[in-house]
From Swiss-Prot:
Binding site for pyridoxal 5'-phosphate: 102, 152, 171, 194, 237-238
Domain of life: Bacteria
Family annotation (InterPro entries): Aminotrans_V_dom, Aminotrans_V_PyrdxlP_BS, Pser_aminoTfrase, PyrdxlP-dep_Trfase, PyrdxlP-dep_Trfase_major, PyrdxlP-dep_Trfase_small
Cofactor detail note: Binds 1 pyridoxal phosphate per subunit.
Species: Coxiella burnetii (strain RSA 493 / Nine Mile phase I)
Protein name: Phosphoserine aminotransferase
NCBIfam families: PRK05355.1, serC_1
EC numbers, comma separated: 2.6.1.52
Biological process terms in GO annotation: L-serine biosynthetic process; pyridoxine biosynthetic process
Length: 360
């Protein structure tokens, strides 16, 4: 079997050990004569899978007991609506940071429900970093403070948790489980699974119990109410059972790797060596302020963009897949989530060096 190094931004690479487990269990899960994909979501087999996945995630992230962990459908984009629907309550204002493509989309959705107040706008820096926090325009009162921890398209990542007394809401879709952080600083965190936690179709929400007491907007459908999902333990209807199962396997994999802190060190090494190569090169360029460079999504351009197609063609021929940049920005993007090995990053750097020698 020959597998390539997959640098896709999402759906993204899944650890091989996890894929082997899925293969071995697919037809007969734990001797029951059925696949876990075939069992009832309310049967004891899947209930056990679901409860174990939640316990493991709570342990990995040190999630306090005062938080519910929800396993939802709809992707992260649905959270752009669910957050204001559930958290605005009597407020007319919510604070947002525009740090790139995904935060901008969230801001657009929020305008359907409130007056989004921009604390700062990275557009002023051409989305190459975040303006200094001392310059942010912060109101004294608002329903919540929303930001995207890692912008997958723009290649920007927050190296700190914003300092605010407002309820923090964070989109961690592309870097949850990639580094330790203090969950208790947040009111709500959400992340789609297809970056670091498996399959598209599952979104994880970690929400403080106090926020579940807020009254949703009157027009909020019952299915979009966090409190109801919490009450029903994410079983209002049939959840994405196979994606939930796979996420649970990945949580086990993270534990077997030594936990989130061990992965954080590995992720830092992977990103550092790739950025170091790009910075030394006269052929490749990354425009992001080093302080805000993403460890998960490394964007770069070729000095001669007429060579883009050739670069991608030769990369694919060398077992390096899905390096094409997002359609809005162009260029290249290497997504190096938890499942990407250091050997994969080394192979990419070696190929880039050889390509530069031939065409630089």
């Amino acid at each position: 079997m020959s597998r390539v190094y997959n640098f896709s931004a999402g759906p993204a690479a899944i650890p091989e050990e996890v894929l082997f487990t899925v293969r071995d269990e697919l037809l007969d899960w734990h001797g029951i004569g059925m696949s876990i994909a075939e069992v009832s979501h309310r049967g004891e087999e899947f209930i056990g899978v679901a409860e174990e996945a939640e316990r493991d995630l709570r342990e990995l992230l040190a999630v306090p007991e005062s938080y519910h962990i929800l396993f939802l459908q709809g992707g992260s984009r649905l959270q752009f609506d669910m957050v204001p629907m559930n958290l605005l309550a009597n407020h007319k204002k919510a604070v947002y940071i525009d740090s790139g493509v995904w935060s901008n989309l969230a801001i657009r959705e929020a305008k359907n429900y409130c007056d989004p107040h921009l604390a700062t706008n990275a557009k002023e820096l051409n989305y190459t970093g975040i303006p200094d926090q001392a310059t942010w325009d912060m109101p004294n009162e608002a329903a919540y403070f929303y930001y995207v921890d890692n912008e997958t398209v723009n290649g920007i990542e927050f190296p700190f948790i914003p300092d605010t007394d407002l309820t923090l809401v964070c989109d961690m879709s592309s870097n949850l489980l990639s580094r330790p952080f203090d969950v208790s600083r947040y009111g709500l965190i959400f992340a789609c699974a297809q970056k670091n936690m498996g399959l598209a179709g599952l979104t994880i929400v970690i929400v403080h119990d106090d926020l579940l007491k807020r009254s949703p907007l009157p027009t909020t459908p019952s299915y979009l109410q966090y409190a109801l999902h919490a009450k029903e333990r994410s079983f209002i209807n049939t959840p994405p059972t196979f994606a939930w199962y796979l996420a649970g396997l990945i949580f086990k994999w993270v534990k077997n790797q030594g936990g989130v802190a061990v992965l954080a060190e590995r992720n830092q090494r992977k990103a550092a060596k790739l950025y170091k190569f790009i910075d030394k090169s006269n052929f490749f360029d990354n425009p992001i302020n080093p302080t805000y460079r993403s460890r998960m999504n490394v964007i770069f351009r070729l000095a001669d963009e007429r060579l883009n197609s050739l670069f991608l063609k030769e990369a694919t021929e060398n077992g390096l897949a899905n390096l094409k940049g997002h359609r809005l920005l162009g260029g290249m993007r290497a997504s190096i989530y938890n499942a990407m090995t250091e050997e994969g990053v080394d192979a990419l750097i070696n190929f880039m060096g050889q390509f530069e020698k031939r065409h630089g």
